[in-house]
Amino acid sequence: MEAVVNSDVFLTSNTGLKSSYTNQTLSLVDEDHIHTSDKSLSCSVCNSLSQIVDDDFISAGARNQRTKPKRAGNDQAQQTTKKDCMVSIDEVASTHDWSTRLRNDGNAIAKYLTTNKYDTSNFTIQDMLNIMNKLNIVRTNRNELFQLLTHVKSTLNNASVSVKCTHPLVLIHSRASPRIGDQLKELDKIYSPSNHHILLSTTRFQSMHFTDMSSSQDLSFIYRKPETNYYIHPILMALFGIKLPALENAYVHGDTYSLIQQLYEFRRVKSYNYMLLVNRLTEDNPIVITGVSDLISTEIQRANMHTMIRKAIMNIRMGIFYCNDDDAVDPHLMKIIHTGCSQVMTDEEQILASILSIVGFRPTLVSVARPINGISYDMKLQAAPYIVVNPMKMITTSDSPISINSKDIYSMAFDGNSGRVVFAPPNIGYGRCSGVTHIDSLGTNVMGSAVHSPVIVNGAMMFYVERRQNKNMFGGECYTGFRSLIDDTPIDVSPEIMLNGIMYRLKSAVCYKLGDQFFDCGSSDIFLKGHYTILFTENGPWMYDPLSVFNPGARNARLMRALKNQYKKLSMDSDDGFYEWLNGDGSVFAASKQQMLMNHVANFDDDLLTMEEAMSMISRHCCILIYAQDYDQYISARHITELF
């Protein structure tokens, strides 16, 4: 019965067709400065471009390739910068036939809306399905529901599927200023066509043969070189150490630099950039980067960060976990300001939100109660990059813990104070928190009652768990020496979630490092010492703990874990006789393994965990949880009818 209620709530939720996107806080383009590859103390964009020039991604024999730019027309209509001007998405996203047919269906729905003078302010998914039935539009792929909705969502005052001309990609497409062309010409000199093409081809080829870190090119992983101090952040490992549906398409197959180039020179994008373009054109809020004062420079810096993350993905999947100071992407991610969130973010939420915002990735569509005029409430569809879980605002007991499972997954609410979607099961007392709106399935505002919030997920679903007890008082402990206190309230995390008839498995988790995770996991230490990641690979849970190479005690713990894993292989998973083996036949193996770890090299098998160990760590220390479909099942396409 609950599934029926959830379906009804979703179908009748307001889709919010009119776009609220506005990007009027920054100027269009810097008229006095063209970004080059020369290092500058006053321009962070030039500094990041200089790192791209100095960086040799991959050595390969390839001739320099030159793209032939299309001549810019003299049509004055293209030079408009009116804030209320609209441009058709169909003009921007001209790709192959498969996407053209999808957009034609979206245009037909939009035309039907305007011809019949529908009130778009109250438009629902049920209305769209009814119109599809009348127009004989049959769409069986479940992902096409997302795509059709994004096309129709931007319909405002006419039959064209539109976005505002304040969006930077539309300004690039319309050549709103001659300085845009000057800047992109300079970029063509900086981005070596050969090197960039090789980087794209390599990461895409890797993606074809990569499942998780157990299928890495080299199972002997290098954590550090003597001259390096930076490492791949555990959040990057959680997102790209396992192939996640939808995110892989946006980050590995899509490319922000080539997207900008194609929009300006050819006024259309190629098929591999199509989903990246749709994600970007339908984002709700722009991002602002500290030290960057105009829209075009922001897009250039976004392209630079996409390229830096792409290189990190390539290294992750080759088993290279260290990086030079210039290659570290974390400092750039920390400079992004998220205009849609009014609350101070912790370091880990900032990094997660920044990585996803670079490609506009918001895989979760939730029907939540939103306040109207401060006196009433309406159910609206809200796209979210991740769901926030705050244990410190939840009242729990041993009999009623915080549970993330198939039953409670429909308990979502909108936090008006921060602008985020939060996980709010009915038993945790969230109703007393300011800004959080609860509404029951009958439409009556009932604070603290069970929430019925239907959820549709495009491939992956992410949770961010707020465990820092004083995140609004202090920040930047990396630079000040201040250590956060961590709330280690246990969470009942289900390894599998059944959502709308589709199985989503726990693929990875980022956890707070409070002590050494082998000897001290049962200690009462509550001070943050860093992060580590647990990936659920085909060979079992695997831990990525980059900070272990900097601490002798942690290295000894890793050595003990590696020796135990080796002994279990030899003794058929038995622990009996381990120390006798270590003092006898295993002494040679122990000496060689110790030498490997001293050289900051480890094999994949060294850091395997049991399922019980992994789930115990995740329960008390997790800060990010990532659920996803199996990649092959996601690709094989499902029906829209299975969503309800």
From Swiss-Prot:
Q: How is it modified after translation?
A: The 73-kDa precursor is cleaved to a mature protein of 60 kDa during virion maturation. Proteolytic cleavage of major core proteins OPG129, OPG136, and OPG098, which occurs at a late stage of core formation, is required for production of infectious mature virions (MV).
Query: Which residues are removed as the propeptide when the protein matures?
Result: 1-61
Q: Which UniProt keywords apply?
A: Virion
Signal sequence segment: none
InterPro entries, from UniProt? P4B (IPR004972)
State the residue spans of region: Disordered: 61-80
Query: Got a GO cellular component term for this one?
Result: virion component
Matching Pfam families, A to Z?
Pox_P4B
Q: Where in the cell is it found?
A: Virion
State the family named in the UniProt similarity comment for this chain: Belongs to the orthopoxvirus OPG129 family.
Protein's job: Major component of the virion core that undergoes proteolytic processing during the immature virion (IV) to mature virion (MV) transition. Essential for the formation of a structurally normal core.
Protein name listed in UniProt: Major core protein OPG129
Task: Provide the species name.
Answer: Variola virus (isolate Human/India/Ind3/1967) (VARV)
